[in-house]
């Protein structure tokens, strides 16, 4: 991938390993078709009233000949601000049900760029961001990491997507995915020696990374590129690659602003998760009616009323109280 004549991503591996089939090598090209698409559409809500969806597409049909007789399509869509690509498996006699073992997609960068990243995790994205060169990010991330107690750390050294990158020449690169439906979410393995990233799919408890049935397509892998970081934020590339809205009636969808009690327990506002200072409490065992409240749990009627009053006075549409009340005493709720 090039931007203004300069390389952004160097030649990189593609392919998927299924338990039933190796779809990473032994292919020959059956066909390659170019096309152009240009439309303007109106989202239900968003930053723009109208969105232009304009790209050049390359559809490459691949075949594993001889005894396998398998067909796979790799579809590329090139926009003014980046690239999206995905794998497609049409219906065919030699494949039906598949279990994903691994995805081999790589993103080979051109140097020791700066990353703006958080650790790859199977459960949460709630980490402080680290800014460091690829060669230094492992150590820098460990220094920056604050353990929360509910992490599910990836089994290899990974970072979360979307991943923001800045090159030494001042170019901004963003790696992410679009149209994530019936497939595992993607983290990125980090090779801090070769400055390489590769797909790391989130597994289930058995280590499986997807259960698929043909015909199918994977999510889009996306690479956005700009010499202005603001253009990455303003890009509609991922939105254009996502599936269209399937709802026939969208009249009830209205954008609104809201404030919430939940965030107070994360941002140091004084609220805590603990109803009581009794640290040995166990759900289903502890009788919370006999505990003395510490006064720091923000999800109580008096405090929520304060949020409601603040919202009303400041033109905020709603208050979100996203926390369980089941363990609070009656007079607290």
Give short role names for the model-derived ranges.
Residues 303-322:
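Catalytic domains of carbohydrate-active enzymes, especially glycoside hydrolases
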Residues 326-333:
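Conserved small/polar residues in nucleotide/adenosyl-binding loops
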Residues 216-231, 236-302, 314:
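An acidic-aromatic substrate-binding cleft motif
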Residues 262, 321-324:
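Active-site-proximal beta-strand/loop segments in catalytic clefts of secreted hydrolases
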Residues 1-248:
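N-terminal accessory beta-strand-rich subdomains and adjacent acidic, glycine-rich linkers
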Residues 119, 271-272, 323:
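Short, solvent-exposed loop/turn and secondary-structure capping segments
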């Amino acid at each position: 991938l090039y931007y203004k004549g300069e390389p952004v991503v160097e030649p990189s591996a593609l392919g998927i390993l299924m338990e039933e089939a190796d779809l990473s090598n032994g292919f020959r090209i059956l066909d390659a078709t170019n096309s152009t698409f240009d439309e303007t559409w109106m989202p239900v809500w968003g930053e723009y009233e109208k969105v232009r969806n304009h790209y050049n597409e390359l559809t490459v049909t691949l075949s594993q000949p001889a005894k396998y007789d398998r067909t796979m399509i790799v579809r590329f869509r090139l926009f003014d601000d980046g690239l999206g690509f995905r794998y497609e498996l049409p219906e065919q006699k030699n494949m039906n049900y598949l279990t994903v073992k691994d995805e081999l997609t790589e993103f080979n960068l051109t140097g020791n760029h700066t990353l703006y990243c958080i650790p790859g995790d199977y459960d949460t994205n709630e980490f402080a961001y680290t800014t460091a060169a690829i060669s230094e990010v492992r150590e820098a991330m460990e220094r920056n990491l604050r353990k929360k107690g509910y992490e599910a750390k990836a089994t290899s050294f990974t970072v979360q997507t979307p991943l923001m990158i800045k090159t030494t020449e001042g170019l901004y690169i963003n790696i992410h995915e679009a149209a994530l439906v019936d497939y595992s979410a993607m983290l990125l393995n980090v090779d801090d020696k070769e400055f390489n990233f590769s797909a790391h799919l989130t597994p289930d408890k058995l280590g499986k990374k997807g259960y698929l049935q043909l015909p199918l397509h994977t999510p889009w892998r996306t690479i956005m590129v700009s010499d202005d970081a603001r253009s990455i934020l303003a890009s509609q590339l991922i939105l254009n690659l996502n599936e269209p809205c399937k709802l026939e009636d969208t009249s009830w969808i209205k954008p609104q602003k809201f404030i919430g009690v939940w965030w107070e327990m994360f941002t140091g506002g004084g609220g805590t998760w603990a109803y009581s200072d009794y640290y040995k409490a166990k759900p289903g065992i502890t009788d919370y009616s006999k505990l003395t409240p510490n006064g720091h749990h923000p999800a109580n009627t008096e405090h929520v009323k304060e949020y409601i009053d603040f919202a009303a006075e400041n033109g905020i549409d709603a208050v979100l109280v996203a926390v369980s009340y089941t363990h609070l005493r009656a007079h607290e709720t």
